[in-house]
Amino acid sequence: MTTRILTGITTTGTPHLGNYAGAIRPAIRASQQPGVDSFYFLADYHALIKCDDPLRIQRSRLEIAATWLAGGLDPDKVTFYRQSDIPEIPELTWLLTCVAAKGLLNRAHAYKASVDKNVENGEDPDAGVTMGLFSYPVLMAADILMFNANKVPVGRDQIQHVEMARDIGQRFNHLFGQGKDFFALPEAVIEESVATLPGLDGRKMSKSYDNTIPLFTSAKDMKDAISRIVTDSRAPGEAKDPDNAHLFTLYQAFSTPEQCAGFREELLQGLGWGDAKQRLFQLLDGQLAEKREYYHQLIARPADLEDILLAGAAKARKIATPFLEQLREAVGLRSFRSSVQATAEVKKKATKSARFVSFRDEDGSFRFRLLAADGEQLLLSRSFADGKSAGAVSKQLQQGGEADVRIEGLSFGLWLNGEQVADGPQFDNAEARDAAIQSLNEALAPQQD
């Protein structure tokens, strides 16, 4: 069975060593595995949320495209495209926006962080917040759901957005699927072994901290940057502490286990920091020199990059265009020539009811959700060690087993046989919480024939 994997990088800056080791290199390696259908894209619509400098965005698109290819991505074996070359994505974003609950988007980490910062500074909670920032998770959901990605490699700060994509896709399926699921429900993939590299000052390597080492800068500039890596004051001949040395962490991310063990031993034996920095430069230059040359060749031939990306977009649209047509049909955006006429003769839709949805969580445990008739989540179960246990509780609730709803602040818990088995969402006020409890009681009430 083929697994579809999707990865995007926002085009707001020049790729650095941290981007390469943390995202680009592992993604390229994953694309070379058997049984994988990989989609890689330049998230240039997302870039507009954070950056209003057109020249910077244009330059970053070029640099990131060249970086993927110079790093070893084979465009003939993957689908490689620019987000902005797929017009179906913004259209799908709107379809999903129309079913995405505002309360769900209110809980997005990036939006909440902006609101919290504004409140802390005594400003209006939404000061400086654009609709782009607020609805960013819906655009990300469209990126994922457009191609029915099964797995989405992300950093821990992005797990919530993949979960939101699941929720939005699930709600669309419920409202318009009529027994069919249009969208596969994606899973976030966290690579525990992926490196998070320190920058020149020891903090996480980030453009925000101005502490990066550009990936394909010249050998001279790379050597100069490495010379500025902060180290302790231990002199040559004094034993160094590799586990607390940022320079060693960088070396470890690019070396073989044998090279790393040898470098560790040299530091313990008193290798001077100047010599250690020279070792790091030699390691990086040896790995990146050929890729650097290819990168600069690509940068010098932007028309070739354009052709590669347009070919990837054409490949992606062979999937996106017919799929969006199905979605348009599902929501009622149909041709008047269609044999199915939206007239009074069409039978009234069958009344939708609440439903239980089982799934397996990232940690391998089993859980279930209870969705209301409109697709809103009413309950999220606690974790169960196996599917049988989760299914038994779900079945007992569906059969009208005596459940006890207990209010917990602006949320509530569901108890069964003296044990808490599920939790409700966190609500903005008591009225919304009480309305949800009413819907829950109706959903769990035994059905009369």
UniProtKB/Swiss-Prot annotation:
Its main location: cytoplasm. GO terms for biological process: tryptophanyl-tRNA aminoacylation. GO terms for cellular component: cytosol. SUPFAM superfamilies: Nucleotidylyl transferase (SSF52374), YegP-like (SSF160113). Its EC number is 6.1.1.2. The keyword Nucleotide-binding applies. It holds the Pfam family tRNA-synt_1b. InterPro entries: aa-tRNA-synth_Ic, Rossmann-like_a/b/a_fold, Trp-tRNA-ligase, Trp-tRNA-ligase_bac-type, Trp-tRNA_synthetase, YegP-like_sf. The keyword Cytoplasm applies. Belongs to the class-I aminoacyl-tRNA synthetase family. This is Tryptophan--tRNA ligase. It comes from Pseudomonas putida (strain ATCC 47054 / DSM 6125 / CFBP 8728 / NCIMB 11950 / KT2440).
